[in-house]
Regions:
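Structural motif
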Residues: 73-77
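C-terminal-of-GTPase-core extension/linker across diverse P-loop GTPases
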Residues: 1-71, 83
Length: 84
C-alpha cells in the first residue's frame, strides 16, 4: 500500500506494508523523522480531492492529528511533525 507526502517541490508516494504505524511510515522517508516523531497530520486522498485544497480541508476539520499508534491507510496524505 502507499501513502503520500506533498510539499512545494514535489508530491511523492511511499510504499509500506499494510498495518504500518505512522512512526514506521515516517522511517521510510528518513530515520530521523521516525526517531523524533511527534504526530502526523493526515487527510485521505478522497477528502482532499473533494475539498480541492488543504486550506478548505482544514477549515472543514478533515485534517486529523494522529499519534504513534495510528495505522496508516491506503492513500493517506501525511505531514509528519518531528523533533531531533
Amino acid at each position: 500500500m502507499s501513502f503520500l507526502t506533498a510539499g512545494e517541490p514535489e508530491v511523492r508516494a511511499w510504499t509500506i506494508k499494510k498495518g504500518t504505524t505512522a512512526p514506521n511510515a515516517a522511517g521510510k522517508i528518513h530515520s530521523d523523522i521516525q526517531r523524533g516523531f511527534i504526530k502526523a497530520e493526515v487527510i485521505s486522498y478522497d477528502d482532499l480531492i473533494k475539498e480541492g485544497s488543504m486550506v478548505q480541508a482544514k477549515e472543514k476539520g478533515l485534517v486529523r492529528q494522529e499519534g504513534k499508534e495510528y495505522i496508516m491507510q491506503e492513500g493517506d496524505i501525511v505531514l509528519f511533525k518531528f523533533n531531533v
